[in-house]
């Protein structure tokens, strides 16, 4: 690639236009180095509030703050060159009113450089999504299993498994589309429901524990590569065991330090050369 070749970042319009064409690849990232790696293949990078559990050891996502999302979102934007970057609106920063959601979303986009925000919610969020999209803030909706509402739902339980629950998820996704969302994440739902939503909606569906029929898939990267093992959802496929690789490297380093075989000459400056010290008068 020449020095003059310019990489164009995928826009929300481009993402929306993929409906029914191929399959969108989406992963999470919370740092610039991870974003750079994921950016090689991803169409969409989601800076999820899952950062609280994955990086900070929190028991859930409820303690994640807007400032945290801004810091991690900005890092991801710096690391990613071509993927569309979407940042989560964390708990308590958008539920109070559309105006509150706008203030939070405006800060996220202005201070991170991301392309869109993602928010969890059912039909009660319809007015908020419309308020944001009417004011130029692209929104990715999130329906089905919603981690921010896990307490009210009695835990992390699959949704849409009975007719009433399925209707609620279906109505929420359709309402989000009508309100202007450019795509929707469908998490932890009955496969038939996710498939039906994908066939019904005119915006891309991105599944996580949903259906292979969705217009795209997303996983938490640390789950997928085996770097986070505190809890593994049943819908995660592990493609590597990063923890094992890192653990072996750390143990080898500790062994080499204790045996004084690290650092080697190649890791030192002027190894083997005699010490030369200027006297105090000369140095002054």
UniProtKB/Swiss-Prot annotation:
Biochemical pathway: Cofactor biosynthesis; (R)-pantothenate biosynthesis; (R)-pantoate from 3-methyl-2-oxobutanoate: step 1/2
UniProt cofactor note: Binds 1 Mg(2+) ion per subunit.
Residues at the active site: 187
A Pfam family hit: Pantoate_transf
Keywords: Cytoplasm, Magnesium, Metal-binding, Pantothenate biosynthesis, Transferase
GO MF term list: 3-methyl-2-oxobutanoate hydroxymethyltransferase activity; magnesium ion binding
EC number: 2.1.2.11
Residues reported to bind Mg(2+): 49, 88, 120
InterPro entries linked: Pantoate_hydroxy_MeTrfase, Pyrv/PenolPyrv_kinase-like_dom, Pyrv_kinase-like_dom_sf
GO biological process, one term: pantothenate biosynthetic process
One Gene Ontology cellular component: cytoplasm
Subcellular location: Cytoplasm
Catalysed reactions, semicolon-separated: 3-methyl-2-oxobutanoate + (6R)-5,10-methylene-5,6,7,8-tetrahydrofolate + H2O = 2-dehydropantoate + (6S)-5,6,7,8-tetrahydrofolate
Cofactor field: Mg(2+)
Enzyme class: transferase
Residues reported to bind 3-methyl-2-oxobutanoate: 49-50, 88, 118
Function, as annotated: Catalyzes the reversible reaction in which hydroxymethyl group from 5,10-methylenetetrahydrofolate is transferred onto alpha-ketoisovalerate to form ketopantoate.
Family, similarity comment: Belongs to the PanB family.
Protein name, entry field: 3-methyl-2-oxobutanoate hydroxymethyltransferase 2
């Amino acid at each position: 690639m020449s020095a003059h070749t310019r990489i164009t970042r995928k826009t929300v319009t481009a993402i929306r236009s993929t409906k029914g064409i191929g399959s969108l690849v989406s992963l999470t990232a919370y740092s610039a180095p991870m974003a750079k790696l994921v950016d090689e293949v991803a169409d969409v990078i989601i800076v999820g509030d899952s950062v609280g559990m994955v990086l900070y050891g929190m028991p859930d996502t409820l303690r994640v703050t807007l400032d945290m999302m801004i810091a991690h979102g900005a890092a991801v934007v710096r690391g990613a060159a071509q993927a569309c970057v979407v940042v989560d609106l964390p708990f308590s920063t958008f539920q109070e009113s559309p105006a509150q959601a706008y203030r939070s979303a405006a800060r996220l986009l202005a201070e991170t450089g991301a392309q869109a925000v993602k928010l969890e919610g059912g039909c009660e969020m319809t007015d908020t999504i419309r308020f944001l999209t009417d004011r130029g803030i692209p929104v990715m909706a999130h329906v089905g299993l919603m981690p921010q509402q896990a307490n009210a739902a009695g835990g992390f339980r699959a949704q849409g498994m009975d007719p009433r629950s399925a209707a609620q998820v279906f109505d929420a996704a359709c309402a989000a589309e009508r309100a202007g969302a450019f795509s929707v994440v469908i998490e932890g739902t009955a496969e038939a429901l996710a498939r039906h939503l994908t066939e019904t909606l005119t915006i891309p569906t991105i599944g996580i524990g949903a259906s292979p029929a969705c217009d795209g898939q997303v996983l938490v990267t640390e789950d997928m590569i085996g770097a986070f093992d505190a809890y593994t959802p049943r819908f995660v496929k592990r493609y590597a065991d990063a923890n094992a690789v890192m653990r072996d490297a750390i143990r080898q380093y500790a062994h080499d330090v204790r045996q004084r075989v690290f650092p080697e000459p190649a890791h030192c400056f002027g190894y083997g050369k005699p010490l030369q010290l200027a006297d105090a008068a000369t140095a002054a």
